[in-house]
């Protein structure tokens, strides 16, 4: 069942080094702490104490990020050479402990964020700005006053500081705090502000005039508020004041996107993950505490459950049976041995998406099976393995988005999934309308039922009420399944679910478990190379432009390019790729900016995240989404392996890092050739198009000959190619003119000439549009459809729907063929380790095959994909390449 996005909670942002340094110096006031070997442990002791405190308070910080300082020179240090230079060097004893502390944080499962060239304060400012949650900054640094708002608070370890407290303490608003710092300076960071003007006068100036800029715009008013000496200092130190304000201003845009759900507080005590290290460094009392402390009950952290204790003595009873011992579970399993047993099931997760329990419904009776020690599960791993094996052997399992549940059972309990009987109502909903697949929206759409919204679950006060909610959801799941099976979904689509989509889910699970290996040392080198290159590019760009600004800020870039440099503007002052390409020749920095952006995206999307996501075998396990696109095309996330660039040299460097899992294997890439155009020939039955494919001719050259004649055919082939593909993507003359960079009239003339030469294609496309208008549906090769609502639609919307409908026919049918091909190959090599399907990218399949039999395996896979997938009126064709690295799978 679809799990809700968590909208409530607090994000804790930790000023890591400041916290650790303070702990170290507090411990060093007395005798410096060391272990029995004489190694200093004061900072590590502070870290352990901090984690203990945070774990105790974890309900108030369900999300946590440790912000780190950049290891390279920061922007502020580049602006002011003396920045922070007045600070004493850190003691050697402390420096020895910092790498250990950072390693411990990562081992404990905490998310640590460092951004090259920026301080931890900037990381915190950016994350606090992006955060959808209430945010608490753990620091004593007064610079964070500028961030205070209804959503953001500052906590110094004892006291919470809010926006109103800033007004009360300093007499100014948080938004004025950088102006305040610009005047008074900051001795700890070594910027001066205005010499001789203190907090009292700074407050008066800002209360009267509002900002540093307004003060200097109204010097006659400022003069009346200051002594003559202070006024002279204000005039003299103007440059210092604005530099100080700039240095005090935290960068809120050094991080553009962030997955906040990835930084959930670990469900178990993080210190358990560093027990060996604690022993090595002499934390004996901490180890003793860990051994003596009971495992906490965390049922109350589940998104479906509230934050009250899970156990109570309320007399109210639930209709759910809690399976707390072997006897009732064994009795339940015996009931399943009769034929046609159906079990409606869902996982119960905590806020970190960790599985706590399995809830299921059988013959109108609900059951709750705790699986984690945190819920006092009494069952051994072996007992549960046997129980789930029997359950899947005897019963059909029905759920909404079943893949996570089945993947969990396979990963944790090694339950075989090959011959199980399953039904996924999310797939059924997808086949009825691919744009409505969420459990809540499907219930509302088809059963006119609304579940209690997840965000209101905090109103429940007892364990019984929580279980009752699970019972309500499971019964709703049963009604939804019955709705689809008893007329809510056409019989041909029910057959499609049974014969194609459900087996395909099992193929996807196999691909996810297999994973795609990366060359980790290569990616570590590439990460550093990209870091260095980004730094060089940034310096080159800033030198060419002559202004120091944040290159990652579209707003600042827009101001610099269009206002300072006076480059030709677009209406929205946009700096997206399309806009920058139009002014590419107007300034030498533009090409470098585009290069910087591409590299920065690769760095932040792939190099660093891939190293974080790899497992112990250096494999990346993406998650495939079967119901995520309206056309039926497969998508993936965490990470998105289908989006790894292929057309740029830098993008190919990312693909180069993906390799075969061992020296006995190699990679095989098999790519369908012009699959959408073959479908166009099949559907339209155009004799010229069919003949070209049947005789193996160059289809784009043949089209070019038909349009422009033999003499110009080769020269105009690219235009013919754009028209060929444009038709199946629903492209009109406007889009074609933009694609080819030609006039609208010329684009129209090409399309008219094309349809005049291929009238049967025009007739077919017109028939399809009429059919879409009539039925509000666009059908694929296998009978799937996409739904369009033309009610009240104007001509513009209708035109868009018709283009999308035509596109859905071809993209959806191509998806059908890819699924059939993947199923055929998977069935042919079932339980055969010589062939492993790793990935689908558009019309290409990536396999891992035994190298010793590579030519024979390639030939057999191509034969299946070419000849056994579907009897089109024209042949399917594939090209194939064998290599050791992904980037080499090309001609």
Curated annotation (Swiss-Prot):
Residues 492-890 are annotated as: Polymerase. Gene3D superfamilies: 3.30.70.370, 5' to 3' exonuclease, C-terminal subdomain, 5'-nuclease, Ribonuclease H-like superfamily/Ribonuclease H, Taq DNA Polymerase, Chain T, domain 4. It comes from the Bacteria. Residues 1-313 form the 5'-3' exonuclease domain. CDD domains: DNA_pol_A_pol_I_C, H3TH_53EXO, PIN_53EXO. Residues 314-488 form the 3'-5' exonuclease domain. One of its GO terms (molecular function) is DNA binding. The keyword Phosphoprotein does not apply. It catalyses: DNA(n) + a 2'-deoxyribonucleoside 5'-triphosphate = DNA(n+1) + diphosphate. InterPro entries: 3'-5'_exonuclease_dom (IPR002562), 5-3_exonucl_a-hlix_arch_N (IPR020046), 5-3_exonuclease (IPR002421), 5-3_exonuclease_C_sf (IPR036279), DNA-dir_DNA_pol_A_CS (IPR019760), DNA-dir_DNA_pol_A_palm_dom (IPR001098), DNA/RNA_pol_sf (IPR043502), DNA_polI_H3TH (IPR020045). Its EC number is 2.7.7.7. The keyword Protein biosynthesis does not apply. Transmembrane segments: none annotated. One of its GO terms (biological process) is DNA-templated DNA replication. Keywords: DNA damage, DNA repair, DNA replication, DNA-binding, DNA-directed DNA polymerase, Exonuclease, Hydrolase, Nuclease, Nucleotidyltransferase, Transferase. In addition to polymerase activity, this DNA polymerase exhibits 3'-5' and 5'-3' exonuclease activity. Belongs to the DNA polymerase type-A family. Single-chain monomer with multiple functions. NCBIfam families: pola, PRK05755.1. This is DNA polymerase I. It comes from Helicobacter pylori (strain ATCC 700392 / 26695) (Campylobacter pylori). The gene is polA.
């Amino acid at each position: 069942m679809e799990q809700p996005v968590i909208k409530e909670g607090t994000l804790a942002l930790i000023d890591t080094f400041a916290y650790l340094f303070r702990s170290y110096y507090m411990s060093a006031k007395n005798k410096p702490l060391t272990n029995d070997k004489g190694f200093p442990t004061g900072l590590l002791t502070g870290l352990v104490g901090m984690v203990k405190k945070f774990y105790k308070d974890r309900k108030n910080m369900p999300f946590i990020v440790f912000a780190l300082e950049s290891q390279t020179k920061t922007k502020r240090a580049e602006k002011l050479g003396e920045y922070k230079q007045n600070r004493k060097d850190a003691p050697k004893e402390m420096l020895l402990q910092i790498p250990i502390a950072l390693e411990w944080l990562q081992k404990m499962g905490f998310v640590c964020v460092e951004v090259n060239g920026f301080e931890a304060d900037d990381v915190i400012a950016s994350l606090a700005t992006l955060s959808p949650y209430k945010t608490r900054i753990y620091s004593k640094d007064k610079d964070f006053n500028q961030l205070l708002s209804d959503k953001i608070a500052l906590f110094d370890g004892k006291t919470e500081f809010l926006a109103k407290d800033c007004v009360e303490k300093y007499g100014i608003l948080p938004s004025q705090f950088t102006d305040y710092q610009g005047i008074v300076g900051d001795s700890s960071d070594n910027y001066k502000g205005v010499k001789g003007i203190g907090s009292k006068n700074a407050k008066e100036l800002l209360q009267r005039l509002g900002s540093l800029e307004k003060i200097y715009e109204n010097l006659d008013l400022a003069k009346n508020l200051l002594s003559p000496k202070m006024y002279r200092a204000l005039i003299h130190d103007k440059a210092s004041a604005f530099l100080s304000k700039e240095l005090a201003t935290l960068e809120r845009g050094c991080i553009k996107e962030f997955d906040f759900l990835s930084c959930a507080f670990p469900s178990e005590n993080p210190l358990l993950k560093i027990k060996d290290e604690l022993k090595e460094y002499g934390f004996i009392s901490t180890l003793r505490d860990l051994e003596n402390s009971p495992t906490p009950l965390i049922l109350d952290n589940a998104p479906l459950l509230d934050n009250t204790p899970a156990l109570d003595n309320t007399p109210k009873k639930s209709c759910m049976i809690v399976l707390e011992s072997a006897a009732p579970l064994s009795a339940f399993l015996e009931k399943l041995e009769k034929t046609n047993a159906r079990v409606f099931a869902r996982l119960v997760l905590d806020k970190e998406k960790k599985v706590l329990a399995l809830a299921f419904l059988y013959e109108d009776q609900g059951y709750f099976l705790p699986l984690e020690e945190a819920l006092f599960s009494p069952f051994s791993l072996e007992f549960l393995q046997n129980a789930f094996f029997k359950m899947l052997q005897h019963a059909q399992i029905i759920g909404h988005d079943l893949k996570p549940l089945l993947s969990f059972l396979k990963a944790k309990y090694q339950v075989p999934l090959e011959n199980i009987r399953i039904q996924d109502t999310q797939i059924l909903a997808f086949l009825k309308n691919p744009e409505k697949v969420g459990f809540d929206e499907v219930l509302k759409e088809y059963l006119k039922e609304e579940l209690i919204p997840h965000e209101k679950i905090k109103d429940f006060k007892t364990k019984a009420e929580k279980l009752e909610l699970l019972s309500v959801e499971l019964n709703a799941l049963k009604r939804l399944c019955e709705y689809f099976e008893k007329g809510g979904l056409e019989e041909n689509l029910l057959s499609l679910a049974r014969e194609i989509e459900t087996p395909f889910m099992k193929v996807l699970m196999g691909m996810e478990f297999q994973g795609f290996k990366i060359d980790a040392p290569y990616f570590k080198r590439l990460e550093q190379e990209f870091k260095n290159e980004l730094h060089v590019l940034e310096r080159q760009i800033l030198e060419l432009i002559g202004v120091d600004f944040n290159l990652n800020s579209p707003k600042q870039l827009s101001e610099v390019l269009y206002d300072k440099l006076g480059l030709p503007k677009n209406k929205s002052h946009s700096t997206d790729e399309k806009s920058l390409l139009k002014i590419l020749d107007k300034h030498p920095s533009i090409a470098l900016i585009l290069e910087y952006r591409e590299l920065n995206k690769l760095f932040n999307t792939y190099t660093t995240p891939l190293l974080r996501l790899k497992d112990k075998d250096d494999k990346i396990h993406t998650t495939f989404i079967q119901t995520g696109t309206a056309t039926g095309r497969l998508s993936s996330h965490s990470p998105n392996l289908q989006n790894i660039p292929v057309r740029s040299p830098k993008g190919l460097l990312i693909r180069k890092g993906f390799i075969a899992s061992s020296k006995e294997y190699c990679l095989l890439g098999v790519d369908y050739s012009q699959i959408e155009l073959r479908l166009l020939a099949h559907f339209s039955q155009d004799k010229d198009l069919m003949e070209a494919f049947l005789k193996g001719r160059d289809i784009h050259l043949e089209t070019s000959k038909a349009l422009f004649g033999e003499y110009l055919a080769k020269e105009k082939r690219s235009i013919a190619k754009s028209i060929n593909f444009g038709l199946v993507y629903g492209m009109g003359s406007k889009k074609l003119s933009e694609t080819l960079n030609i006039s609208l009239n010329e684009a129209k003339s090409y399309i008219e000439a094309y349809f005049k030469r291929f009238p049967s294609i025009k007739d077919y496309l017109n028939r399809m549009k009429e059919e879409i208008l009539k039925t509000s549906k666009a059908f694929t090769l296998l009978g799937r459809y996409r739904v369009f609502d033309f009610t009240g639609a104007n001509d513009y919307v209708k035109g868009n729907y018709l283009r999308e409908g035509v596109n859905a026919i071809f993209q959806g049918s191509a998806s059908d063929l890819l699924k059939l091909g993947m199923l055929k190959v998977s069935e042919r090599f079932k339980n055969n380790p010589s062939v492993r399907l790793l990935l689908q990218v558009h019309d290409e399949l990536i396999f891992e095959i035994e190298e010793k039999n590579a030519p024979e395996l390639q030939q057999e896979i191509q034969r299946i994909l070419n000849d056994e997938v579907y009897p089109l009126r024209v042949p399917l064709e594939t090209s194939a390449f064998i290599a050791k690295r992904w980037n080499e799978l090309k001609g």
